Every structure is written in structure tokens, then in C-alpha cells.
Amino acid sequence: MSLNFLDFEQPIAELEAKIDSLTAVSRQDEKLDINIDEEVHRLREKSVELTRKIFADLGAWQIAQLARHPQRPYTLDYVRLAFDEFDELAGDRAYADDKAIVGGIARLDGRPVMIIGHQKGRETKEKIRRNFGMPAPEGYRKALRLMQMAERFKMPIITFIDTPGAYPGVGAEERGQSEAIARNLREMSRLGVPVVCTVIGEGGSGGALAIGVGDKVNMLQYSSYSVISPEGCASILWKSADKAPLAAEAMGIIAPRLKELKLIDSIIPEPLGGAHRNPEAMAASLKAQLLADLADLDVLSTEDLKNRRYQRLMSYGYA
């Protein structure tokens, strides 16, 4: 898979293009007198060092771009790489099956769990089918149905958050978008089973929160979590989306800042260059964190889970 490089990664892209050119020449003519392998090795080492240097000093806006990277692993990628025997469940039993939310039962190291997550889609047709990862009310009602099923069968719930936000269309509003989100917030706070939430890409406003109330909340290193997109914030405050980088810094959308504010519990490190550079390694790290979180929560009674979750929610904000 050829990588898509973001604007701030262009120096890396130029090196990788040179490596690809030399590799192609080497394949075409293996009888060349010059030692291309040594040059390729040197350029690869230089590319790694340059990547380390660039990624050691990323700003909030650059991280926001990484969170939206088109090759970043989505929910179903992690389901494939970190879980076994996934059986997808569909529909809200009231209106429709929203493809922007996927969910079902799977096994995590042999243990049955309920998985729920946003799914954006990659190719144009799939993006449209998934509504670019923006759920309608029926998506959140499907998620709630699966959560209630998990509670009945005493299965832990694992959610993956990756959405620009809930769908703002007229039809979604007419079908009760705000009510569906609010109901999920209320019901998730009352669930009697462990709930572990992880932001794997974009965590956009209420659309993210509707599956984001949990006992443990994690973020991948280059994910973002905010009440509005940087572009939206900039358009409101400065009347120009061009101020998005400034807004991103001011909003505190990145994992270290949110951990400092005690809004999340853990930051899961990503492979050098981001999760899309090595999805298998990212899935292994994510799986290890999920297993550790469930081990911590397994020792708690139902009442302890509910009380801890309540105290967590009440700790947010400033008096």
C-alpha cells in the first residue's frame, strides 16, 4: 500500500519517492554495476530519522490532520486485527440500520465482548454508505440496543470512537438526533457491565460522546477529541476557517492535554509515523490496553462500577 503524506510530511514524502525510484530501477535491471542497495538503506535510515524528528514536535493542528488520515485504521480494521469470531448485529428495531455505526459480539482473547464503533469508509461508495462516519439517530439507537443486550448477557462493552460528529441533516433532527444522543449518555452511565471507550481517530462532539461514556476512556496518541472541529471553532470565533491551526491549539484537542485535565485515562502510543504506518502493531498495542483495562474493572462489583462512573462524570468541569 502506497502511503498518503500530509503537508507537514512532504520532506519524508520526497525521501520515500527517491527510495521507490531506486527500488524500481534495481528491480528492472539486477545487473547494474552500482550498489543501489546501500543507497536505499542509507535513504531509509534518513527517512526514519526525519520522521522521528518531525513527529517529536507535532502541533495540535498536525495531530488533528493525522486523526483524519484517509489510511488510518477504522473500527472494522481493529476488529479484524485484535478480535476473533466477530458477528455483526444490525438495526435499531425501530427505523433502520445505520451503517455509520457498526457493532456486534466478538471474542477478545477468548472472552465474549460487545463491540460498538463508528465506521467512516474508504472508497467513495463506502463513504457514502457509511455517511462519512456521521451517525443518524438510528445509529445511536442501534448502539444502545447492543449495549443493553451486553448488559443482559453480562458482557463487557468496548467502543471505538471515530467521527467528525453526529449527522446534522434535517431528517436526523426530525427523527430525534439530540434525544438519541442524550438517551445514550444517560443509559451508558447506568450500565452494570464494564465499558471501555477508545478514541481511535476523530472524537467529534456529541456524536463521539454518545458512545463515549465509560469506566475507562483511552485515546490513541494521534487522535483528537473536541466539542467542535478546529475549522468550525475558527469560523465562529474569527469568521475564517483559515484560523483552524490557532483554534486547534487553543481548544486542547490532543491526548496529553485531555489526560492532564483528567478527561481520559490512558494514551496508547502509535507506531512511528502514525497508526496507518503499521496497523498490526497498533492493533497489538490497543489489544494490550483493552485487556489491562478489563482486568482492572473485573474486580469491581456492579454497584462499584456505577458509583465510580457517576463520580467520574460529576468530576468534570469547574465549580
Swiss-Prot record:
Gene Ontology annotations of biological process type: fatty acid biosynthetic process; malonyl-CoA biosynthetic process
Localization in the cell: Cytoplasm
One Gene Ontology term of the molecular function aspect: carboxyl- or carbamoyltransferase activity
Pathway: Lipid metabolism; malonyl-CoA biosynthesis; malonyl-CoA from acetyl-CoA: step 1/1
InterPro entries documented for this protein: Acetyl_CoA_COase_a_su (IPR001095), ClpP/crotonase-like_dom_sf (IPR029045), COA_CT_C (IPR011763)
Family of the protein in this entry: Belongs to the AccA family.
HAMAP family: AcetylCoA_CT_alpha
Assembly notes: Acetyl-CoA carboxylase is a heterohexamer composed of biotin carboxyl carrier protein (AccB), biotin carboxylase (AccC) and two subunits each of ACCase subunit alpha (AccA) and ACCase subunit beta (AccD).
Functional summary from the UniProt entry: Component of the acetyl coenzyme A carboxylase (ACC) complex. First, biotin carboxylase catalyzes the carboxylation of biotin on its carrier protein (BCCP) and then the CO(2) group is transferred by the carboxyltransferase to acetyl-CoA to form malonyl-CoA.
Name this protein carries in UniProt: Acetyl-coenzyme A carboxylase carboxyl transferase subunit alpha
